[in-house]
Amino acid sequence: MLTYETWEENDVSFSEEDETKGALSVLSWAYKEYENEIVYACSFGVEGMVLLHLINQVNPSAKVVFLDTNVHFQETYELIQKVRERFPSLNIIEKQPKLTLDEQAKLHGNKLWESNPNLCCKIRKILPLEESLANEKAWISGLRREQSETRKHTKFINQDHRFQSIKVCPLIHWTWKEVWRYVYKHSLPYNPLHDIGYPSIGCEKCTLPVGEGGDSRDGRWAGKVKTECGLHYQ
């Protein structure tokens, strides 16, 4: 089994005719390699809808973890319910932070997402994912190379130094148009915020719509240098 400690470069080839651009092949490899020791960390963005559909074909009872920061858009929570109805066999876990919002405010002040967004992300996303990955050998992410400069070198199979794990990224070669083409083709549910200018959807407090021609991550932590929550630093 390929683990963080036994890391060696791996790649997956795929034919030009493969509609999934290697995604199904990568997922098949991953679930064969790790069986029940792999989890998909899903934010329920549009890429997530594609991956959930693909994962359901490979392993209908796969584990899926959603990092519930308690400050997501209502539309996101409603989408999760639709996904549960569409893919009832998937094991969707809504992982909560150790601190409630009130407890966080007492310790660090109100609106920590404004005063110290890095700490807020650590408390409400990074630490919960660490806990979720503690008993796993690998995890799956919906990163695409096209999304931003920080993601353009992502590979199918990555040694993840942040969580000392293996990170599997099946959609690295997909474009934004291909993601949506797949969603429409298979009539997949998606977050309606995508229709009003939100290409990337995170917490409600830190996500704004993006103007035409903007980077898909421009709406995240707008006005700050921060462009990543910290889950995907290598």
Swiss-Prot record:
Its EC number is 1.8.4.10. GO terms for cellular component: cytoplasm. Belongs to the PAPS reductase family. CysH subfamily. Catalyzes the formation of sulfite from adenosine 5'-phosphosulfate (APS) using thioredoxin as an electron donor. NCBIfam families: APS_reductase, cysH, PRK02090.1. Transmembrane segments: none annotated. The keyword Metal-binding applies. It is an enzyme of class 1 (oxidoreductase). The active site is at C229. Keywords: Cytoplasm, Iron, Iron-sulfur, Metal-binding, Oxidoreductase. Pfam families: PAPS_reduct. It catalyses: [thioredoxin]-disulfide + sulfite + AMP + 2 H(+) = adenosine 5'-phosphosulfate + [thioredoxin]-dithiol. The gene is cysH. Its main location: cytoplasm. It is found in: Cytoplasm. It comes from Bacillus cereus (strain AH187). The keyword Iron applies. Pathway: Sulfur metabolism; hydrogen sulfide biosynthesis; sulfite from sulfate. InterPro entries: APS_reductase, PAPS/APS_Rdtase, PAPS_reduct_dom, Rossmann-like_a/b/a_fold. Coiled coil: none annotated. PANTHER family: PHOSPHOADENOSINE PHOSPHOSULFATE REDUCTASE. One of its GO terms (biological process) is cysteine biosynthetic process. This is Adenosine 5'-phosphosulfate reductase. [4Fe-4S] cluster binds at C120, C121, C203, C206.
